[in-house]
Amino acid sequence: MPTVSQPKNLGDLLKYEAPNLYSRDQDTVAAAQNLSLGTVVGRETATAKLKVIDPSATDGTEIAVGVLGNDVDATLIDREDAILIARHAIVARGALVWPTGLTVAQKATAVAQLTALGVLVRDSA
């Protein structure tokens, strides 16, 4: 019997959000990145644009500000159509996308930063 493999969708990531899109912001992802739904992101202080979280950075991207709610290909230009899950939400731990090489402690720090914003990370089926 053939199997079907489907890409992740918002339902795999977002388990609860506040009514009237309160949990979501439309935001800008900085160029030179191709980010997937579920990517944990930080905000570069100088540009106010989103980038993948980088705990070793000192430009603001070391602090988690939310989780992407859609795929964003900003390889060539800044993309202003990113959906940021920024507050009052529950996301599935297994659907989060982390940069390679992050330690367990760095992930725990980022999860704590998300929790402080009201974005709870839970184990989910």
PLM region spans:
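Surface-exposed, low-hydrophobicity beta-strand/loop segments enriched in small/polar/acidic residues
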Residues: M1-A125
